[in-house]
Amino acid sequence: MKILLKSSMLCASILLAACNNDDQQHNPTSPETSTPSKYYQTKTPYQPQQDLNKYQATPPGFQPVFTELVARHGSRGLSSMKYDLALYNLWKQAKAEQALTPLGEKLGADLESMMKANILLGYGVEGIRQFGYGNESMTGIQEHRGIADRLLKRLPDLFKAASTQPASILVQSSGVDRAVDSAKFFTAELIQQQPQLKTHITPISYTSLASSSVLSIEDGGVDRFKLYFHSLNKDQDLAQPLSAQQQAIYDASQAYQHFEEEDTDLANKLDELAKNSRAEQVAKSVLNPLFKAEFIQKLGTTGYVFSNTGSYSVISPKGETITEKGKGKNSIASAVDAAAYLYELYSISGGMKTELKGVDFDRYMPVDAAKFYAEYNDANDFYSKGPSFTESNSVTSAIAQGLKQDLFKQVDAIVDQQQAHRAVLRFAHAEIIIPLATSLELHNMMQPLPLRQTYSYNSSTWRGELVSPMAANLQWDIYQNKQGITLVKMFYNEKETLFKSSCNYARYSNNSFYYDYLKLKQCYQIQ
């Protein structure tokens, strides 16, 4: 997390909007009954955004014939031993100097619980290949199982038909551990609920939670060009000759990576965000309840820079001693750093309730401070992954063009009566979901800002917790009637969602969430 933020605060729940008709607004990602934000940002645990029983009825004469999904992996633990160990080293020094408040005394045990939970994350859990940092939590596993359950309930007739058709369910992922695991837990739930589906899922490697069941590009279970397009590279992705479409995606990926690493306008904007006069004040609101003032003032001076050096050991459920070492690359050199690191633990804790066993990091993070750090992270994501600034010429969303085209290509196969599958299920990452949502231009969600403006909760409705919470997903259900008319209906985080407003003419009727597919394809100028 970069430190820290040019911000202007607004109320907790400014929600993304899509018009329901020309005069009426409809929120595509805000829940029907909203609860106050915890400001976990993109680490927000997943919740379906609409009641399954409140979806708009299917137009008379139409039957579901196909569905497709793109989903982010579920809730996870910390990616590596960074913030937790650095804070623990800081805490131990404060303890040695008797510089802790009564609440600060409690922080030590909670940091130990956080490290233990991450070191053992996934231990003994079927479907987790190697326990430890970076794995999905039990919350994350249940998120994808829940989405699978509701998909079966939403489209019972479609999956009944799928159970009679060979290779009717195609599953793909980025090939990265968390995405692969999410795919396997999703398909495991499909199989648990409807065992007859097991022989109809392809590739077969997705039908087993066993670690010996390995995915590959060769069996079609991994597609980096569609599901890891933000990070394509020569060593991994140019081993085989590329198709024209793959070459275009690869070129877009290189342009995006150059933008992220080299673009002067982006660097200047992120620097502007980092120079926030409120950062020190907010940091003190976090640290003053935990540490004595004289200790906080020493942070950054000689002997008071704390890194993720050293190690921490835990005892596994089988009695083994397991030790995790820090890499020493993450340092706390100021009060601002310390508070921001604590926010990272707070934000990840929401998706680790089972593993943390009642440990509550809420008490260490005032709501206003959480909002401050969430706004800063949202600003960084907005510029680096999301709509960005107008002058960036859509470089952050051009990388999703191949995936967007594939969504339409799968429906084209239905129209042409060439579709071999009843469902195509794809599992990826926030870096995929965010550009895809931007590329589809979901109404009033994805506007870039001119460089002269700076992202804040005042200037934009874009929110990471709404666009890409854990297990964020976009789904298209496809319907046909006997006359061969094809309709598409979109769900974003399981809420009926409209396409961009310029496509309103493609809606099947006024106020309908169903779109005439051929008109929609024309609207998006898909060839």
Feature locations, PLM:
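C-terminal motif of bacterial Sec signal peptides marking the signal peptidase cleavage site
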Residues: 16-18
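A conserved catalytic-loop motif detector
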Residues: 13
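Bacterial signal peptide processing site
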Residues: 20-22
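Signature for phosphate-centric chemistry
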Residues: 27-170, 174-424, 428-527
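Sec-dependent signal peptide recognition
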Residues: 2-10
